[in-house]
């Protein structure tokens, strides 16, 4: 049957990378030849986790069909977020915690999606269901994914299942989740060396919302002003992306991980829909979104309603 490739979405975050590594590990331990790969560059937060638990980053691929017939998707399902030749391979499994959209297969598959804060929380269960011991390093990566997606348990996407799983995994990994978690988040929030291009692509996802083509990028920081100081250059680069991709709306969500608020920078023909979605007024193309930290649970649903 050959090797199955396991990967998450483009512009990978910590859950995408760590869940791919963990699920490939589980598949191999139950007798399925699998390899974790990635569709983009590793961000600073994820690199911190990989270094801390002494794990190698998965290798980068641009296409999958040239080396396998079967793939497993983790942490995503929407085809525009996946590998470019997704239509040329068979998706045999999906393990995810997002909405289902723009997803169709020609053959039956194993599809597992749960309303939890992180794919890693589901994988923690799957190790138990398969009676496979989670090694210390894998536990550390799964913990890192949960901390990342839940913003150290502060995000509205975080469930009790995520918190319980994180504490189980922290015990196996031998770390204090609060201390380790804050160090990891701070590593990801250091934007001082990031180019403008990196700021708007490091965690960007494309969505079809209503009849609109929308891209939502998110960066975490401990100082929003550090990002807005570069607003002119950021807007120029965003406008290039809008033109190149034919986007109706690009929203950069700049999240303060200490205050748990975000600043939205919105550009494009549908930028006014951000005002409708969040009951705010854009000034200089920006608006403060109080208490908004989750793209999945707070930004995408609000924009979906506004654009429908």
From Swiss-Prot:
Keywords: Cytoplasm, Hydrolase, Manganese, Metal-binding. It catalyses: diphosphate + H2O = 2 phosphate + H(+). Its main location: cytoplasm. One of its GO terms (cellular component) is cytoplasm. The keyword Metal-binding applies. Its EC number is 3.6.1.1. It is an enzyme of class 3 (hydrolase). Gene3D superfamilies: DHHA2 domain, inorganic pyrophosphatase (n-terminal core). It is found in: Cytoplasm. SMART domains: DHHA2. It comes from the Bacteria. The keyword Metal-binding applies. Pfam families: DHH, DHHA2. Mn(2+) 2 binds at residues 15, 75, 97, 149. GO terms for molecular function: inorganic diphosphate phosphatase activity; manganese ion binding. Its cofactor is Mn(2+). Disulfide bonds: none annotated. Binds 2 manganese ions per subunit. Mn(2+) 1 binds at residues 9, 13, 75. Belongs to the PPase class C family. PANTHER family: BNIP - RELATED, MANGANESE-DEPENDENT INORGANIC PYROPHOSPHATASE-RELATED. This is Probable manganese-dependent inorganic pyrophosphatase. It comes from Bacillus pumilus (strain SAFR-032).
């Amino acid at each position: 049957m050959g090797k199955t490739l396991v990967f998450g979405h483009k512009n990978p975050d910590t859950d995408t990378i760590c869940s791919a590594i963990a699920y490939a590990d589980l598949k191999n331990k139950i007798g399925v030849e699998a390899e974790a790969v990635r569709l983009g560059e590793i961000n600073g937060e994820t690199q911190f986790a990989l270094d801390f638990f002494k794990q190698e980053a998965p290798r980068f691929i641009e296409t999958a069909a040239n080396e396998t017939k079967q793939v497993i998707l983790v942490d995503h399902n929407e085809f525009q977020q996946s590998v470019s030749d997704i239509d040329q391979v068979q998706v045999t499994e999906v393990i995810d915690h997002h909405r289902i959209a723009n997803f169709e297969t020609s053959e039956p598959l194993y599809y597992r999606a749960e309303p939890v804060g992180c794919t890693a929380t589901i994988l923690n269960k799957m190790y138990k269901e398969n009676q496979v011991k989670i090694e210390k390093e894998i536990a550390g990566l799964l913990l890192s994914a949960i901390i990342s997606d839940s913003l150290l348990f502060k995000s509205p996407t975080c469930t009790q299942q995520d918190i319980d799983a994180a504490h189980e995994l922290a015990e196996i990994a031998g770390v204090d989740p609060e201390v380790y978690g804050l160090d990891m988040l701070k590593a990801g929030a250091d934007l001082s060396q990031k180019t403008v291009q990196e700021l708007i692509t490091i965690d960007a996802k494309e969505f079809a919302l209503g009849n609109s083509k929308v891209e939502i990028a998110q960066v975490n920081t401990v100082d929003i002003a550090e990002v807005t100081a570069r607003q002119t250059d950021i807007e120029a680069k965003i406008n290039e992306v809008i033109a190149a991709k034919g986007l109706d709306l690009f929203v950069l969500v700049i999240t303060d991980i200490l205050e748990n608020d975000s600043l939205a920078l919105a550009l494009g023909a549908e930028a006014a829909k951000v005002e409708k979605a969040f009951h705010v007024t854009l000034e200089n193309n920006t608006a403060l979104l109080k208490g908004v930290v989750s793209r999945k649970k707070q930004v995408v649903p609000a924009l979906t309603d506004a654009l429908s």
